[in-house]
Design a protein with these regions (language model features):
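Bulky hydrophobic segments
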Residues: 1-100, 106-124
Length: 124
């Protein structure tokens, strides 16, 4: 693995770890915000970043076919990661499964995918 690949890999793993830690801490320990559904906005943001980092890591490997394929794999991995975290929250006594959280996660992934595809097509 090159330094470039390793850098994206480490960033992706660290970001995924932060998401996991924040997702499993007791809900009562989370700061409360009074703005309209701010947690959903955060879900969109953190999963958009996760998708971008995952894409950058996959992009650093020339063995995968096309940028589009790398982008779609990145989105799939990140949506599944978000779903797995929601399932983990289902078994935690202080957390709960929230389908709207998973929807926000998926929207973040898809927004990132859109940005990746638009930016990639303009670079051609």
């Amino acid at each position: 693995m090159t330094i470039h690949q390793r850098t994206w890999h480490v960033l992706m793993i660290l970001w995924a770890a932060v998401i996991m830690v924040v997702s499993v801490i007791p809900g009562a320990d989370l700061p409360s915000l009074s703005i309209w559904e701010p947690d959903k906005v955060m879900h969109v943001f953190v999963y958009a970043v996760m998708t971008f980092l995952t894409f950058q890591w996959f992009k650093s490997f020339s063995s995968l076919d096309s940028l589009n394929k790398k982008a779609f794999i990145s989105v799939t991995v990140c949506i599944l990661y978000g779903f797995i975290i929601e399932l983990i929250q289902l078994i935690l006594p202080t957390r709960s499964f929230d389908l709207l959280d998973e929807l926000a996660n998926s929207i973040g992934c898809l927004l990132s995918l859109t940005g990746i595809l638009v930016f990639s097509s303009k670079r051609k």
